[in-house]
Amino acid sequence: MIHIYTLHFKNDYWVDLQVESFKKHIKVPYKSYAIFSHMSSDIYEKRKDYYDYFEVREKGRHIHKGGNYHPTDGNRHIFPVIKQNLKPGDIVIRIDSDAFFIDDITDEFVNKVQDKKFIAIHEPQHEWDLNYRAPHPAFYAFRGEYLNQGLDSAMGEMSEDGHSNWWGLLIKWFKESNVDWYALERSNKVNLHALYFGIYDNLVYHHYAGSRDRITRVDRKKATELNVELTEIMEENHMIDKDVREQLSH
């Protein structure tokens, strides 16, 4: 059994694409869990039956993207629910709102998670230091038993990792638990942007610009190197984003 969780924040733009990818590509039994935050009651009513478990949370411990609900808040709130449903051999997937599957999730993938213990997207361009190896939280897949071995706490609180990321406790948990996470590497044949619009191991697509300002660390580096305004780069990213969204909607 797969327990797959997502947090949708401020808009429901990606729900249909994501849920359809679950239905199309997950070839093993699964339960879907979602937390929605900072949207209208009409959206909540519309989307509540799209998942096996649906919850609304408007306030967490941390400010994030102009709202008072952070991904760690979502993890902390949903993991107790998932733990109630866990059985031996189950795996858990945490997937960003603007990420979805483009290939099948089969027993082979479940076995791979059991073998590798913890699988995550690896995106060096997300980091200031391109040599720093960090698991990006857009996609995590791990043994369900780890939620009873401290992983729930490690993913449920913000902590600096020394590289301006908030998943420091997860990095610490890896070391303490002797878990060497397995990376899904970027596999794009065409890169419209160094970070955005990523495909990983030909399995997962992550848009990156789904619910945030279209400026990343790589864009800030680019602005400095080219001596151009960030607003110029943001506008360029916005136009590419608009085109990609139009293509995804067809």
Model-derived regions, located:
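Conserved catalytic core of nucleotide-sugar-dependent glycosyltransferases
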Residues: 100-172
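A conserved hydrophobic helix/loop-capping motif in glycosyltransferases and polysaccharide synthases
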Residues: 3-11
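Short, acidic, metal-binding catalytic loop of nucleotide-sugar glycosyltransferases
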Residues: 20-30
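Phosphate/oxyanion-binding active-site loops and adjacent basic polyanion-contact surfaces
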Residues: 11-15, 67-75, 162-163
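Active-site-proximal specificity loops/subdomain of glycosyltransferases
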Residues: 35-88
